Amino acid sequence: MNEEKAIKEFVNALKSKYRGRIKKIILFGSYARGDYTEESDIDILIVGDVDFDYVIDLCTKLLLKYGVVINAIVESEELFNKKINWSFHRNVLEEGRVLY
């Protein structure tokens, strides 16, 4: 399954480049719930000190390689903690799957 390969490569690339600077990587949305379709994108929240431009380049590379769209959100740990009680963040934490 290309989606699983893309997710694994995405997480491994981030862990390799930003070792010690990533606090969480969470898969959320339809792939986390298991109700995805072939039209679904892969939603991932990255918490930590990560360069958003690098993430966009990585998403583009994986789109070209696997034909899979990864929709990544990057937040600092401080911002994530400020928003932790917002409904979006509660949903991500409740239904999401922690990848790292």
Swiss-Prot record:
CDD domains xrefs: NT_KNTase_like
Obligatory cofactor(s): Mg(2+)
GO molecular function: ATP binding; metal ion binding; nucleotidyltransferase activity
Cystine pairs: none
Family classification: Belongs to the MntA antitoxin family.
UniProt binding sites for Mg(2+) 2: 41, 43
Protein's recorded name: Putative protein adenylyltransferase MJ0604
Keywords: ATP-binding, Magnesium, Metal-binding, Nucleotide-binding, Nucleotidyltransferase, Toxin-antitoxin system, Transferase
